[in-house]
Amino acid sequence: MPYQYHIQSNDDLVTPYQEVRAGFVALALERNRKATPFVEQARALKIRVSQIERPQDLLQMRDIRPTLLAASGVSDKAAGHLQEQDKVDAIEGLIQNFLEPAGENFVEELVYRFLLTRGDTLGGSMRNVGGILAERKFARYIISALTLSNTSYKWLDKNSKTWLNQPDDDTDIELRLRGLSWNLEGRNRTFIYNVNVPIVRKNIDICLFDCRQNEIEKNIISNPNIYIALGELKGGIDPAGADEHWKTANSALARIRTAFDRHSLKPYTFFVGSAIEKSMAEEIWHQLNSGILTNAANLTQPDQVASLCAWFIQL
């Protein structure tokens, strides 16, 4: 029972209050980090337009048209579908409805409108920030486990979508990492985040495959025999949403077991979560003791995650 190395009771799985508080602070810091480019753009916009005397002059400033469109409430995606005249109409609407009524304060109003739209953009990107931070943290623990066992690895860059060799300096590698591949004691293993598993017909947070990284392709992913372990990773820290996160994860794990059982297969299943309440912990503990769930860990507890990742790379 691999979970017994780091969990002795259901109470061990419950997220302590101080970790909830630390989690909210981490989310706030990430929001500020992501907001910084928008704030700097707003400052640059204010300096750029401070030289004009009236809002209508903005129509002649073609170099900042994308920014003016953003201030008009047009998203980057929507702008790609608009004709040139549509863009002009949107900016004229901004000028007539908001900037001209602001009088001599039209520059401040323009900056405000820009930040308002970018705030919505930021809000959308922040909806899954807990999940993104969780992926980074989990990846760092896997890398640490591999390093500790003196196992070299390749990593999948989510930006270039290419597999790269282990770097000499792996600082912040988790910011761009989508997967890892290694060979330990003659076993080729590759793990990837967010895989749409064909036989489950659902996107699964973590999948561990019995293959090299260069063998990962659609045909391989469709082969149920290639799966070693599948797990759900929930990084949301808000206790109010903890139960819903577990319900979603538990449903996905149940679908995994049912789908693979049809092929007489039983891959390992595990759950890692940041916000785990008492009732959730009791249910997870029951599933572990019953053999329904193979392993679990609270993401806010370093020893638990380190233990689970040490188990993970040995599979």
From Swiss-Prot:
UniProt entry tagged with the keyword Nuclease: yes
- What is the protein name for this chain? Type II restriction enzyme AvaI
Catalysed conversion reaction = Endonucleolytic cleavage of DNA to give specific double-stranded fragments with terminal 5'-phosphates
Q: Mind telling me which InterPro entries this protein's record contains?
A: Restr_endonucII_AvaI/BsoBI_hel, Restrct_endonuc-II-like, Restrct_endonuc_II_AvaI/BsoBI
Q: Name one GO biological process term.
A: DNA restriction-modification system
Does the keyword Metal-binding belong to this entry? Answer: no
> Which keywords describe this protein according to UniProt?
Endonuclease, Hydrolase, Nuclease, Restriction system
Q: What is its EC number?
A: 3.1.21.4
Q: Gene of origin?
A: avaIR
Record-level Gene Ontology MF annotations: DNA binding; type II site-specific deoxyribonuclease activity
Give the matching Pfam families. Answer: Endonuc-BsobI
